[in-house]
């Protein structure tokens, strides 16, 4: 027996353990196969799919572990060690993906204000083509797993939206995504634990953030089972620029 967590977002979540700053330390650890990954690979879909494309990784050695999501593997490894059970990660993340691609049709239909906001404010700033289409990766990577029971959700996404001045989509949308995915992977009544990493705002010009709602939006009321980890990389900024100031992005209770 064991438990499975769903990992989602963009390239931050895809970033492999081999590229992590602590890779050398993790290479020395014992990798016993108690951490297992399913990694989604597809280009999205305009319509909901029944089957998911991907591949399996069982971390029986460093050679396998280093190919896994750094965040996902570290989380699963430590959780497995604490609970004494195998832990699986379904990594659905896609580099460069926008938030609106991860929401399902039923959710946008039930929340027309959010759908109207995406149509009016988000889609006009999207790249040409279908990569940024509403529901795109939900259709191909989340919908096929409906009914599968998961223990919780790991989330790391936001750069693509912030870079295009759409930070408010996160404030508006994350509570909807938590309920959406909790319906897919939970019991249909209770919200799953939702663990999210805030993006490091020092990477973006101030005018990307001003007026977006990104800097003030989420709190414990909006996401009752949510836990938002601030990632400002202060030590790294200090090394690069000589000084840094850490300011919370979200006001989390």
Indicate residue ranges for each PLM-predicted region.
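Cell-envelope and extracellular/periplasmic
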Residues: 1-253
């Amino acid at each position: 027996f064991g438990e499975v967590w769903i990992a989602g977002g963009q390239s931050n979540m895809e970033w492999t353990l081999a590229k992590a700053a602590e890779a050398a330390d993790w290479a020395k650890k014992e990798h016993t196969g108690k951490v297992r990954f399913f990694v989604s690979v597809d280009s999205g879909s305009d319509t909901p799919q029944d089957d998911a494309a991907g591949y399996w990784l069982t971390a029986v050695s460093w050679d396998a572990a280093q190919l896994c999501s750094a965040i996902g593997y570290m989380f699963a490894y430590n959780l497995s060690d604490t609970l004494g059970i195998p832990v699986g990660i379904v990594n659905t993340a896609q580099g460069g993906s926008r938030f609106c691609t991860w929401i399902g049709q039923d959710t946008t239909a039930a929340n027309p204000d959010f759908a109207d906001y995406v149509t009016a404010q988000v889609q006009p700033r999207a790249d040409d083509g279908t990569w940024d289409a509403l529901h795109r990766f939900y259709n191909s990577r989340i919908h096929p797993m409906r009914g599968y029971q998961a223990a919780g959700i790991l989330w790391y996404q936001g750069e693509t939206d912030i870079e295009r001045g759409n930070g408010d989509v996160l404030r508006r949308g994350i509570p909807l995504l938590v309920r959406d995915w909790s319906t897919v992977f939970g019991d249909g009544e209770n919200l799953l634990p939702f663990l999210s990493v805030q993006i490091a705002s020092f990477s973006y010009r101030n005018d990307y953030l001003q007026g977006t709602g990104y800097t003030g939006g989420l709190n414990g009321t909006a996401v009752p089972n949510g836990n938002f980890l601030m990632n400002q990389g202060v030590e790294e900024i200090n090394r690069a620029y000589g000084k840094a100031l850490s300011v919370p992005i979200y006001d989390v209770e």
